[in-house]
A protein has these predicted regions:
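C-terminal "closing" transmembrane helix and its immediate cytosolic amphipathic cap
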Residues: 2-8, 15, 289-301, 312-365
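Functionally critical transmembrane alpha-helices in membrane proteins and complexes, commonly lining
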Residues: 23-88, 108-111, 115
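Aromatic-anchored segments of alpha-helical transmembrane domains
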Residues: 34, 38-41, 115-116, 182-196, ...
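Transmembrane alpha-helical segments and their boundary/interface "anchor" motifs
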Residues: 60, 68-77, 88-123, 127-145, ...
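Interfacial loop-to-helix transition and helix-capping segments at the boundaries
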Residues: 63-75, 140-155, 193-220, 254-280
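Hydrophobic transmembrane alpha-helices
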Residues: 80, 84-88, 159, 163-167, ...
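Solvent-exposed interhelical
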Residues: 160-187, 225-245
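Alpha-helical transmembrane segments and terminal signal-anchor/GPI-anchor hydrophobic tails
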Residues: 214-215, 232-298, 329-331
Length: 365
């Protein structure tokens, strides 16, 4: 397989030393995109508030919260991948300019093209009225396109600008020195929201400025880099797996307890228990060296960014059909999830046959 440069976590990645794909990272990336599609399927069929969920059967409510929480693991996995692949590299002045030109600018161009396509789609299918001024605001990244998944793109574009600087800084610092600020910032960024999820009336706030560390999402990248540097390598996989499940069940318990009290709590990425579960899960993926039916998984991994960009318009159209059908909600969720995955994969496969178009629309390099 031809060698490809390290790119965004959704992107095609190769091991620089062996010139082969890293199996564990392909597993992580493929699972991550499946989880992202799952959470979007849940959010677009269920109304995730206390009134609506508590009016449903216990089974349907538990199904919704489990799938929702599973889906929330997708974005952390992508961010860990970015940190794992991009922060443990040597950046010279020349390579920094190359990174900005090929990686950052390429991602920006792809994002802008999709913003235009999304706005045209929303108008063509009567989801919103056309507004040239609104399109301009969307393209300037001062307003989010009316598609729930697009919050991610401005965030990762902003983070990407500083990746070379962060990588160069980390190269000159021993791991034991990095631990203190990383642990301190993480305790505030993730710990306080986790505390408030258990005690909703707590007045606790995160007052320490985390901007220099990249905020919550920058910390995800740093922890991904820390896994690359051997975090958890001396801990048995069974222990890590048990802790992964325990933290995930803790998040579920908090959500279910909140809904039982009539309070809607839908976990976000700043929750320490969710972040910890995702980090441990990622460290397990990294240990995978081979797997069954790797060709299909490899294709899904390589095209995960394209699927991410393509899936939401398909989801919006298929959702309209499913909403009027008298089927159980869990069945609708599974159908929506699989149908969106299928349509997105087919569109990716077609676009992939036109390399220049794929370069722009799918960010293929």
């Amino acid at each position: 397989m031809p060698k490809r440069g390290n790119r965004h976590a959704f992107d095609r990645q190769t091991d620089r030393q062996t010139d082969r794909r890293i199996v564990g990272l392909d597993y992580a990336r493929a699972v991550a995109i499946l989880l992202v599609l799952l959470v979007h399927a849940i959010e677009n069929l269920y109304v995730m508030d206390a009134v609506h969920l508590n009016a449903m059967s216990v089974q349907s409510r538990i199904f919704a919260i489990i799938c929702f929480t599973l889906g929330r693991l997708g974005v952390p996995l992508f961010l860990f991948l970015s940190g794992y692949l991009l922060l443990d590299r040597s950046y010279t002045e020349l390579s920094i300019h190359k990174f900005w030109k090929k990686n950052w600018l390429g991602m920006l161009v792809t994002t802008e093209v999709w913003i235009i396509l999304y706005d045209v789609f929303l108008r063509a299918f009567h989801f919103q009225h056309w507004s040239t001024w609104g399109l301009l605001r969307d393209m300037l990244l001062t307003n989010q396109v009316h598609m729930a998944h697009m919050w991610y793109m401005p965030m990762i574009i902003g983070v990407y600008v500083c990746i070379p600087f962060a990588a160069r800084a980390l190269q000159g610092i021993p791991l034991r020195v990095v631990f203190f600020p990383l642990a301190l910032f993480s305790a505030y960024a993730f710990g306080v929201p986790a505390w408030k999820s258990i005690f909703p009336k707590s007045p606790a706030l995160v007052l320490i400025d985390l901007g220099f560390a990249g905020g919550v999402y920058g910390l995800y990248l740093l922890w991904g880099w820390r896994v690359k540097k051997g975090l958890f390598k001396n801990i048995h996989a069974r222990t890590i797996g048990g802790c992964t499940v325990a933290l995930f069940l803790l998040v579920l318990g908090i959500e279910l307890a909140s809904y039982a009290r009539g309070i809607a709590y839908n976990v976000w990425y700043n929750n320490a228990f969710l972040a910890g579960s995702a980090l441990l899960l990622f460290s397990l993926f990294v240990r995978i060296k081979n797997g069954l039916d790797y060709s299909a998984l490899c294709w899904l991994s390589r095209n995960s960014f394209g699927i991410y960009l393509l899936h939401f318009p398909a989801l919006m159209l298929i959702r309209k059909i499913l909403l009027v059908l008298p089927w159980m909600m869990p069945a609708k969720v599974m159908i929506l999830w699989l149908a969106v995955l299928f349509v997105s994969c087919v569109l990716c496969w077609i676009i992939d046959h036109f390399p220049r178009l794929a370069r722009i629309l799918l960010y293929n390099r």
